[in-house]
Amino acid sequence: MSIPKSTPDRRVTRVMGVDPGLTRCGVGVVEGGLGSSLKLIAVGVIRTPADLDHAHRLLRIHDGLEEWRDHTRPDAIAVEKVFAQHNRNTVAGTAQAAGIAMMIAARHGLPVALHTPSEVKAAISGSGRADKAQVGFMVARVLRLSAPPKPADAADAVALAICHLWRGGAARRIEAAVATQRRGRRVPRSWKDLAR
């Protein structure tokens, strides 16, 4: 897999979304900022063969995520929050892949955020119960793509990055309003006032 090298525009925030998995770990990098449209930087999947021993599969995920981080230089990493599933082996591998993504963020001093699947679905489609096809459709629509990224793990990673950009941006604006109020200044009455 070839990951395009790119230099982020400092007026926008670049987020690397990670849909963790042991067999397929989706990765999507999106950038956007206040008043600018979202832009897909790169999308793909890190694959590990099932016949490889577990430790070496995790090492491949680590090396792949490091390569993605090196090439795309994100400002933050958003990871899907892992929930217990019926298959304990699946959830263990998924949680380990998520931990690797968080460790890489920490190693490079990047903020890391965990988003639940319902949060991501609600942010991207308006419904926390959207299915994978609906999420993929909305990812393509928001980014003006001719088709959703494939496979679904890649589309989910892009949706995570979009969710973080949208939700993280709102959180930063709220923090700015609170900080302004603490300094004794007038609190903006609308989000547009915060952009000034």
UniProtKB/Swiss-Prot annotation:
The active site is at D19, E80, D153. Its EC number is 3.1.21.10. It is an enzyme of class 3 (hydrolase). Its cofactor is Mg(2+). Mg(2+) 1 binds at D19, D153. Coiled coil: none annotated. The RuvA-RuvB-RuvC complex processes Holliday junction (HJ) DNA during genetic recombination and DNA repair. Endonuclease that resolves HJ intermediates. Cleaves cruciform DNA by making single-stranded nicks across the HJ at symmetrical positions within the homologous arms, yielding a 5'-phosphate and a 3'-hydroxyl group; requires a central core of homology in the junction. The consensus cleavage sequence is 5'-(A/T)TT(C/G)-3'. Cleavage occurs on the 3'-side of the TT dinucleotide at the point of strand exchange. Belongs to the RuvC family. Homodimer which binds Holliday junction (HJ) DNA. The HJ becomes 2-fold symmetrical on binding to RuvC with unstacked arms; it has a different conformation from HJ DNA in complex with RuvA. In the full resolvosome a probable DNA-RuvA(4)-RuvB(12)-RuvC(2) complex forms which resolves the HJ. NCBIfam families: ruvC. HAMAP family: RuvC. This is Crossover junction endodeoxyribonuclease RuvC. It comes from Cutibacterium acnes (strain DSM 16379 / KPA171202).
